[in-house]
Amino acid sequence: MEQHLDAYCMHLRSERQVSPHTLEAYRRDLSKVLAYCQKAQRSSWNDLDIQHLRSFTARQHQQGQSSRSLARMLSAVRGFYKYLNREGICQHDPANGLSPPKGERRLPKTLDTDRTAQLLDGGVEDDFLAHRDQAILELLYSSGLRLSELTGLNLDQLDLRDGLVQVLGKGSKTRVLPVGSKARQALEIWLPLRALTNPQDDAVFVSQQGKRLGPRTIQVRLKAAGERELGQNLHPHMLRHSFASHLLESSQDLRAVQELLGHADIKTTQIYTHLDFQHLATVYDSAHPRAKRKGAADD
């Protein structure tokens, strides 16, 4: 059974070209299912049926696994069995028709426009790291990039004259995004400094030694910027979430936001409509003469 799992992971890496983060998550989830099969003395993937999987997910939920994590695991199982069926190893999918336990949907954390301005307009010291970090912050918020898209960005994907960036997203899908004027200015300052490091490849964002920045370095730098400017933790996806929320709030164009984010399914984008409603509810509560004020007595 383990050799089939190894072969599937190799297929995901070489054929599907999934990101290392996604591959690690799939392997972790499927390894849990494999351990369950071995404990239940199932010797083949054909021996796993919907009742086994239902029992397994219920136990995982009781042990504190969130509904979101279980949904991801079931998605991994479906993809795995699709592969097994195509290879002639199995003739069924035990996850077909199985849904994870429903849980409370967590809304993504965002910065409001004032806090975003406070972060980006905090002032930049005249040194290599400060200008690089400012360009990273501006580009993440300007174009709503994923962290993997930012770290994989090369010089030939940037067109500062026309204000465009081409990124390679999930599933090796490319999309072209606008780059705002503030981000362009920050990049125009950063790129000459980058050239002084004698870069080892065409990466847009490099270290002082000219090496491409990895995800962990960017996460650490953004966390430091958040604590310094806002007194709170900041992670790259928070700027992507803020980009989406602010754009939807201003434009009300869900399809356009979906295209900019690179979401295959508009249901993924719809979570930002909940954030927009929260904003509208706040405006209503503060502006409507008949809105119930906090602490006001019931009529």
Swiss-Prot record:
It is found in: Cytoplasm. PROSITE patterns: CB (PS51900), TYR_RECOMBINASE (PS51898). Keywords: Cell cycle, Cell division, Chromosome partition, Cytoplasm, DNA integration, DNA recombination, DNA-binding. Residues 1-85 form the Core-binding (CB) domain. GO terms for biological process: cell division; chromosome segregation; DNA transposition. One of its GO terms (cellular component) is cytoplasm. Residues 106-285 form the Tyr recombinase domain. GO terms for molecular function: DNA binding; tyrosine-based site-specific recombinase activity. It comes from the Bacteria. The keyword Cell inner membrane does not apply. Gene3D superfamilies: 1.10.150.130, Intergrase catalytic core (1.10.443.10). The active site is at 146, 170, 237, 240, 263, 272 (o-(3'-phospho-dna)-tyrosine intermediate). The keyword ATP-binding does not apply. InterPro entries: CB (IPR044068), DNA_brk_join_enz (IPR011010), Integrase-like_cat_sf (IPR013762), Integrase_catalytic (IPR002104), Integrase_recombinase_N (IPR010998), Integrase_SAM-like_N (IPR004107), Recomb_XerC (IPR011931), Tyrosine_recombinase_XerC/XerD (IPR023009). Forms a cyclic heterotetrameric complex composed of two molecules of XerC and two molecules of XerD. Site-specific tyrosine recombinase, which acts by catalyzing the cutting and rejoining of the recombining DNA molecules. The XerC-XerD complex is essential to convert dimers of the bacterial chromosome into monomers to permit their segregation at cell division. It also contributes to the segregational stability of plasmids. Belongs to the 'phage' integrase family. XerC subfamily. This is Tyrosine recombinase XerC.
